[in-house]
Design a protein with these regions (language model features):
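Terminal domain-start segments
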Residues: 24-84, 177
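Bacterial N-terminal signal peptides that target proteins for export
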Residues: 2-11
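Compositionally biased regions
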Residues: 3, 22-23
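Cell wall/extracellular polymer interaction/catalysis modules
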Residues: 86-88
Length: 198
């Protein structure tokens, strides 16, 4: 009979949970690539990473080690596929973008592309985004907006004009979203100030 002490049992449980809940990079990249090649939007969204860290591990670039991530070379095609479909306005896709927004940090390439397209989505579809945000908490709305406002140089006039355009766009729709935009701008600036540029 095998006797396991409490510490051993707890360690076993932690390992088991991590093994079954951890992000499977290979499985994700294979599923994304297949869905993209098949032009299967729903399968692509299903396979799309749920966390910022996982997204970067799939489409990012490790500038410290000068190393491309698995799907770095196809990030433009893949992300165009995600954003160019009318289904990008479905809750399932917007929820994926919301999940990405937690701990979102500015970076070039794929990360910057998502920021740019999210901002465009907000500007072009205020009614739909207002409906979507009505079902979310202030914290969730602020996080989503902060992702769209994340940048390298927050004092840039082009950046500030986009922020003012968002405020102008959402003023007729929702005072709540305008207030969340103000909070998101402060947080995005604070996050940008903390960036270390190599």
């Amino acid at each position: 009979m095998c006797v396991m002490n409490k510490f051993g049992f707890v360690a076993y449980l932690i390992c088991a949970v991590l093994m079954f809940s951890s992000f499977d990079l290979q499985k994700c990249t294979d599923a994304l690539q297949k869905a993209y090649e098949d032009k299967d939007y729903k399968a692509y969204v299903n396979a799309f990473p749920n966390k910022y860290e996982d997204f970067v591990n799939v489409y990012g670039y490790d500038s410290k080690n000068r190393q491309k991530k698995v799907l770095y070379d196809v990030y433009v095609e893949h992300l165009c596929f995600l954003f160019d479909d009318d289904l990008v306005l479905d809750d399932s896709v917007l929820d994926k973008l919301l999940n990405l927004s937690y701990n979102y940090i500015w970076d070039a390439d794929a990360v910057e592309y998502v920021i740019m397209r999210t901002k465009q989505l907000l500007l072009e579809h205020p009614q739909r985004m207002t409906e979507y945000f009505s079902e979310k908490t202030d914290g969730e709305v602020t996080s989503f907006l902060q992702m769209a406002l994340t940048c390298l140089i927050p004092e840039d006039q082009g950046y500030l004009s986009k922020y003012h355009k968002l405020v102008e766009t959402y003023t007729p729709y929702s005072n709540r979203i305008v207030q969340c935009l103000k909070i998101a701008l402060k947080r995005a600036k604070k996050a940008s100030d903390a960036l270390v540029v190599y």
